[in-house]
Amino acid sequence: MMALVRDRRAHYVMSIVIRWVHCFSSSLRGTFGTRWEAMKAKATELRVCCARRKREAREFKPPQMRGSTRLNISDDLKIGFFSTDHATQTDSSEILSVKELSSSTQKLAQMMKSLQVDFGFLKQLLQLKFEDRLKEESLSLFTILHDRILEIEKHYQQNEDKMRKSFNQQLADAIAVIKGMYQQFFEVEEENVSLQDASTVKTNILLRKLKEKEEVIKELKEELDQYKDFGFHKMESFAKETSSPKSNLEKENLEYKVENERLLQIISELEEEIQINLKENSGLEDELISMKEMAEKDHKTIQKLMDSRDRLREELHYEKSLVQDVINKQKEDKEMRKKYGSLSVKVARSAKGREASLSPWPKSPPSTTALRPHSATMSVSSAGAQKAKMPKKALKEDQAVVEDKHGLESQIEALKANLENEKKKVERFRKEADRLNKSWEKRFFILRNSFHVLKNEMFTRHTLFRQFAVLADTSFNYIKVKPLLVQSRTTMTAISSSSHCTSSIDGKHVDVVSDQAALQLSPKGKLSESPKEESLEEPSMRQSSPAETVD
């Protein structure tokens, strides 16, 4: 009975082990392939052995014991009073199976230990991989945050630079306004300083500073050398003199050390100032490069404006020539009309002469006209047929005069219609020329104002850059300014100022008048010009409104 229980337990344990091995075979097949195969083979062998032992035990049992489930060792030993006491002994045939079961359990325990070790290694490997992945993710997050912080700092610095520049610009504007208000009532005589760029002034100032600092450094180095030489000589003299006390030597040595430290500190400060000046020089060089680029851009814009002005002048000359051609055509049309008028007058006079020449006398000569060929033939026929009867001749002449009159009236009506058409054409050409003149006057006015605005902007920009360069590093050691001489403008001679003002005003007036005259006399001819250009000119006129206030 005990053997059967043990066999069942062994079978149950083996089934659990095999099931567990089947569950983890998919995950551990790559790393523990050979060990898994060995363990599986051993498990199958144990299973086969257990089945064979059971079968042999059943076959070799005596017939009297085949029906009972209890073993026969404890049947003869009458120890207890109950039936449960009979199954406490082990049969001799069961000893071998117990040994095999114990050996198999030991092997299974060893395998479990090895599996525990392997699982420990796997756990450590997964933990290390997780830590590496965590470090990578944290590093990526740190880099992203660091880049974002750098971008924010850069944006903040840019905003700070913009604010600083705007404040400097406002300060320069306020100073310029105060200077202009001050110069309205007083005349200030200052030292004539050569007009240089702001960058050159700054570089000269910094070079002067560098030279001064270098001279100071040289002087301090010379003093240091002198102190060192003097100290060494003194030490030698003190060593020779045995009567000199040691306390004085120590005091002087301390004083020299303090002086040396002070000089070294001054030298370090001067070196720091030199580095700062070098940085300022580099910044000024960058500003100089940017100013040069801005000047090149301004020069390019001015060149473009000059090219556009030349192109507009060429178009203006072309329009002038076209309008002159139109005027010449109009003059030719007028001459043709005059010729037609004189012709009509001559025809009327000839008609009147014919009517006067017609009379009731038979021997009156026939009237001839130069315009109608059939009248000449009639006169020739009438001259050839003088012997005809008088009533027939009179009737024929009356018919010819009536026909001539009708032809002349039709010609006069056609000429009048042509005259009306020509008048309408001339009026239309005149209106078109006026419209084109006005549009071109507007264009030239806008172009001139924009050109003046660009010139004023360049001038103000350069003046403000100079003011900024002077105000950026204000110091009393840079430029020695003379005392200002303030004079009231009322004490100045009125002749020079009046002459200067009148000459400048006359010059401006003459320029404006000449421009207006040129614009009025310059007729424009592009009759087929589209109205899109006028619509494009309107925003430019709106933009040029502040330029008019500036002028």
From Swiss-Prot:
Superkingdom: Eukaryota
Region described as Disordered: spans on this chain: 354-389, 519-551
Compartments, as annotated in UniProt: Mitochondrion
Mitochondrion found in the keyword field: yes
Keyword annotations of the record: Coiled coil, Mitochondrion, Transit peptide
Pfam families attached to this UniProt entry: DUF4709, DUF4724
Transit peptide: 1-36
Chain segments annotated as coiled-coil in the UniProt record: 203-315, 405-439
Biased composition (Polar residues): 366-384, 541-551
GO cellular component: mitochondrion
Assembly description: Interacts with NOD2.
Record's protein name: Uncharacterized protein C10orf67, mitochondrial
